[in-house]
Amino acid sequence: MRPPPALALAGLCLLALPAAAASYFGLTGREVLTPFPGLGTAAAPAQGGAHLKQCDLLKLSRRQKQLCRREPGLAETLRDAAHLGLLECQFQFRHERWNCSLEGRMGLLKRGFKETAFLYAVSSAALTHTLARACSAGRMERCTCDDSPGLESRQAWQWGVCGDNLKYSTKFLSNFLGSKRGNKDLRARADAHNTHVGIKAVKSGLRTTCKCHGVSGSCAVRTCWKQLSPFRETGQVLKLRYDSAVKVSSATNEALGRLELWAPARQGSLTKGLAPRSGDLVYMEDSPSFCRPSKYSPGTAGRVCSREASCSSLCCGRGYDTQSRLVAFSCHCQVQWCCYVECQQCVQEELVYTCKH
C-alpha cells in the first residue's frame, strides 16, 4: 500500500542538508585511521605543503580531497573526528556481540543492518562535533568562534568566551558529505537519513553557558557562550536510537515522484505504517548473530564478559572460561605535608571470564 504523499515526507526535512548527503568518511570510509608521522593531537595546524600532504594521506573522495586542500587545519580535524567516532562506537558496544571491531567493517557497509546505520550516524556526529570544536579552538583558518548568540536581553550579556561554532560545522558538512549513489534507491536514502540523525544528535546537545559578573554576585553582566555537550552524551543518544531503530522499506511519493522511506506497520498494529521520525535510525535488513567469525565481525570467542551482566548473551550459549589473575592497585593513601599523596601498592586476585570458542 502506498502512503499518502504528505505522510511519506514526515520527518525527512533535516537541518537543510541535501537529501542525498551521506557520510562516506570515518567509520564509513575506505580507511578509518590514517597516521600523520610526527604529529600529535595537540599539534598546531599544518601549513603549506605539509597541509597538502596530510590531505593526500587521507582516503577521501576527489571532491573531499579538494575541500581538504582548501581548508588549512582540516586534515587534522578529519583525523581527530575519525578517532573520536571509532572510540565512541567501541565504547558504546563494548558489552555487545558486535563491538564495533574494525575487522568486518567493510562487509557491514555493503549491507543495510542496524550496525551500518550506527556507523553512519556516529561518523557524521563525530565530524560535526570535532569541526565545531576545532573552530572555537582556533585550529581552522576559515572559521572562528560562534558569534551569533541569539539570546534575549542582549544588553545584559557580554559575550566573551569562544563558543563552539556549530553553524559553520553543519554548513561545511553539507559540502563535504556526499553520496556515492544517487538518491533514487532505498539504501542511499537510508544512509542519508542516518547521517542526519548523527548531525541532529550533536545539534541537540548545544547548550548556552553563562558566568555572572558584578558586585557580590549581582549578575549585572553575564558572559555567555555556546558549548557542545561531551561527545559521550551524543554517543549515548545514538546508542538509544540504535536500540530502537526502525526497519524500513520504500514507497513512491506520487506528489514528488521519488522514493521515500516507509516503516511498515507492526503485526497487530492498527496503523497502516508511517514514515520514520527524523531522530530514528533506520535499517533494511535483520542483523546476523555476530556469534561466529564472518565477513561482518570476528565473532565473540575469547571476549571478556561479565558473569552477572553479559556472559549469557555475549557467549551465545557456548559458555565461558574462568581465569584468576593478580591485579596491582594503589591503597592506604595518605596526604603528605603540602603537596603530594603517598600510596602503597596492594595486590588482589581477580576473576576474568572469557567466552569459549
Curated annotation (Swiss-Prot):
It is found in: Secreted, Extracellular space, Extracellular matrix; Secreted. A lipid is attached at S216 (O-palmitoleoyl serine). SMART domains: WNT1. The keyword Lyase does not apply. One of its GO terms (molecular function) is co-receptor binding. Disulfide bonds join C89-C100, C135-C143, C145-C162, C210-C224, C212-C219, C291-C316, C305-C311, C315-C355, C331-C346, C333-C343, C338-C339. Palmitoleoylation is required for efficient binding to frizzled receptors. Depalmitoleoylation leads to Wnt signaling pathway inhibition. It comes from the Eukaryota. Moderately expressed in fetal kidney and adult kidney. Also found in brain. GO terms for biological process: branching involved in ureteric bud morphogenesis; canonical Wnt signaling pathway; cell fate commitment; cellular response to retinoic acid; cellular response to starvation; collecting duct development; cornea development in camera-type eye; embryonic cranial skeleton morphogenesis. PROSITE patterns: WNT1. The keyword Disulfide bond applies. InterPro entries: Wnt, Wnt_C, Wnt_CS. Residues 1-22 form the signal peptide. Gene3D superfamilies: 3.30.2460.20. GO terms for cellular component: extracellular region; extracellular space. Forms a soluble 1:1 complex with AFM; this prevents oligomerization and is required for prolonged biological activity. The complex with AFM may represent the physiological form in body fluids. Component of the Wnt-Fzd-LRP5-LRP6 signaling complex that contains a WNT protein, a FZD protein and LRP5 or LRP6. Interacts directly in the complex with LRP6. Interacts with PKD1 (via extracellular domain). Ligand for members of the frizzled family of seven transmembrane receptors. Functions in the canonical Wnt/beta-catenin signaling pathway. Required for normal embryonic kidney development, and for normal development of the urogenital tract, including uterus and part of the oviduct and the upper vagina in females, and epididymis and vas deferens in males. Activates a signaling cascade in the metanephric mesenchyme that induces tubulogenesis. Acts upstream of WNT4 in the signaling pathways that mediate development of kidney tubules and the Muellerian ducts. Belongs to the Wnt family. PANTHER family: PROTEIN WNT-9B (PTHR12027:SF84), WNT RELATED (PTHR12027). This is Protein Wnt-9b. It comes from Homo sapiens (Human). The gene is WNT9B.
